């Protein structure tokens, strides 16, 4: 889900919706882990990422590395979320091809605003924190190949806010 902590830039009344309520998510994670499965959740927005991490941490009574839970997208992770991902051994499954929407005047800027757009897809920060990244296309028809240049060379057209790094 693209649930945000603050409203969307183009809709001040909207923060996104839960696809699965956070309480139910915790129950699903516990069931999957008890059965020996890796759990994967899609989380794009900062609030969604926090909810998934909460569920994973609540479930991590044993060895969090053993479960190898994963979050797909992880596009708007703040410093705290990146630290939590690393500490919990959560795999960040990211899609560099989505960076095409982070260009100036692109979809992200329209929906998130310039400041939040500059904080999306923080791959360098994730790697520096020790995260394991899995790169994939997330079902994009052109496959993963077009995303490779974005994964390697995607500095934004404008400077990022202090404390953030180019992907």
Pin down the residues of each PLM region.
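Residues that cap or flank secondary-structure elements
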Residues: 20, 26, 72-73, 114-115
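Active-site-adjacent helix-turn-beta-strand microarchitecture at beta-sheet edges
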Residues: 1-38, 82
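Short amphipathic alpha-helices and their capping/turn segments at secondary-structure boundaries
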Residues: 77-91
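Aromatic- and carboxylate-enriched substrate-binding clefts and catalytic-loop regions
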Residues: 67-78
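Structural motif corresponding to alpha-helix initiation and N-cap regions
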Residues: 22, 78-79, 119-120
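His/Asp/Glu-enriched, well-ordered alpha-helical/loop segment
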Residues: 29-40, 47-69, 83, 94-167
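Divalent-metal coordination cores built from histidine and acidic residues
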Residues: 1-5, 89-95, 129-130
